[in-house]
């Protein structure tokens, strides 16, 4: 079964996120558990935690259907020790918030070397950052998102994702989220079913589908291989509809959150309905 949704707002309280997801016909959702533009947030109160859990139950969202995202400020591969510690503390806080909310996944961008340390050293720092957080939490999987490779961001090659996973001690609590826009911008073609087969065969060989814990379904304004991260609505960008139809009709993408981060929230309900229809087309065939 496909879990399809979008990154919804938690404005006014975390308990509002499941309702907003249900309103657009989603069977999955992503959210920030705190203001993603701030390093620290007030601790979660028992009331906030209970309200969120009740709302998830009311709208039939299990932890497997929810893909929280951490703050964009965090850089788990930061070359400067003080800044690295600040990021590690913030990431641990994000993991602990997920644990308190009964969530089992935390999606994050791996990190950037800022042109100050070698790529290999940065990847090792990211893996060690994950190890530190996993050692102090239970039940939450760290889900590494592939990047477009913009600037000095790492995680744009499958080999880099595999290198991070290799450095994580508890392999049962590390995973990957593949963003289609990022992959396309990084040079992984998705424009045809044949291209999708080739790209995901490479993913399976280098990273492994056992680590795929979520996806971001985004078309791309940016050109193929441009290393520029610019999302677009499904079918409106340079990837086109075929990739998303192909994903909907492949059972390897069942049972994980498939999250829209496309640029027009007003049509998320339409995009979700279209994605669901592609899945139905497969069943009928």
UniProtKB/Swiss-Prot annotation:
Which one GO biological process term can you cite for this protein? base-excision repair
Q: Where does Zn(2+) 1 bind?
A: 69, 109, 145
The answer to keyword Lipoprotein applying to this record is no
Q: Name one Pfam family in it.
A: AP_endonuc_2
- Judged by the first EC level, this protein's enzyme class is hydrolase
Q: Which residues bind Zn(2+) 3?
A: 182, 229, 231
> What InterPro entries would the database entry show?
AP_endonuc_2, AP_endonuc_F2_Zn_BS, Xyl_isomerase-like_sf, Xyl_isomerase-like_TIM-brl
> What cofactor does this chain's UniProt record say it requires?
Zn(2+)
> Mind telling me which residue stretches traverse the membrane in this protein?
none
UniProt keywords, alphabetically: DNA damage, DNA repair, Endonuclease, Hydrolase, Metal-binding, Nuclease, Zinc
The free-text cofactor remark is: Binds 3 Zn(2+) ions.
Q: What is its EC number?
A: 3.1.21.2
- Write down the Gene3D superfamilies for this protein, in alphabetical order: Divalent-metal-dependent TIM barrel enzymes (3.20.20.150)
* Superkingdom classification of source: Bacteria
What chemistry does it catalyse, as a reaction equation? Endonucleolytic cleavage to 5'-phosphooligonucleotide end-products
Annotated SMART domains:
AP2Ec (SM00518)
Residues binding Zn(2+) 2, per UniProt: 145, 179, 216, 261
One annotated GO molecular function is: phosphoric diester hydrolase activity
Main role?
A: Endonuclease IV plays a role in DNA repair. It cleaves phosphodiester bonds at apurinic or apyrimidinic (AP) sites, generating a 3'-hydroxyl group and a 5'-terminal sugar phosphate.
Family to which this protein belongs: Belongs to the AP endonuclease 2 family.
| Protein name as it appears in the record | Probable endonuclease 4
Q: Which organism is it from?
A: Salmonella paratyphi A (strain AKU_12601)
């Amino acid at each position: 079964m496909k879990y399809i949704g979008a990154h919804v707002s938690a404005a006014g309280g975390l308990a509002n996120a499941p309702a907003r997801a249900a309103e657009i016909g989603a069977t999955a959702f992503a959210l920030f558990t705190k203001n993603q533009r701030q390093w620290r947030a007030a601790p979660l109160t028992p009331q906030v935690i209970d309200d969120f859990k009740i709302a998830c139950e009311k709208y039939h969202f299990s932890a497997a259907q929810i893909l929280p995202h951490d703050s964009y400020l965090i850089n788990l591969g930061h070359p400067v020790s003080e800044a690295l510690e600040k990021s590690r503390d913030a990431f641990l806080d994000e993991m602990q918030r997920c644990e308190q909310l009964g969530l089992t996944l935390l999606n994050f961008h791996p990190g950037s070397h800022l042109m100050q340390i070698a790529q290999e050293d940065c990847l090792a720092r990211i893996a060690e950052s994950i190890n530190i957080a996993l050692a102090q939490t239970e039940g939450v999987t760290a889900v590494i998102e592939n990047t477009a490779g913009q600037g000095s961001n790492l995680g744009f090659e499958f080999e880099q994702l595999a290198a991070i996973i290799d450095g994580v001690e508890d392999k049962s609590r590390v995973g990957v989220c593949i963003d289609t826009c990022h992959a396309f911008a990084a040079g992984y073609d998705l424009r045809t079913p044949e291209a999708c087969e080739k790209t995901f065969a490479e993913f399976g060989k280098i990273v492994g589908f056992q680590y795929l814990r979520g996806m971001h379904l985004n078309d791309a304004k940016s050109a193929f291989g441009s290393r520029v991260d610019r999302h677009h609505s499904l079918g409106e960008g340079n990837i086109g509809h075929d990739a998303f139809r192909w994903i909907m009709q492949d059972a390897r993408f069942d049972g994980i959150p498939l999250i829209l981060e496309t640029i027009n929230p007003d049509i998320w309900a339409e995009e979700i309905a279209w994605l669901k229809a592609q899945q139905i087309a497969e069943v009928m065939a």
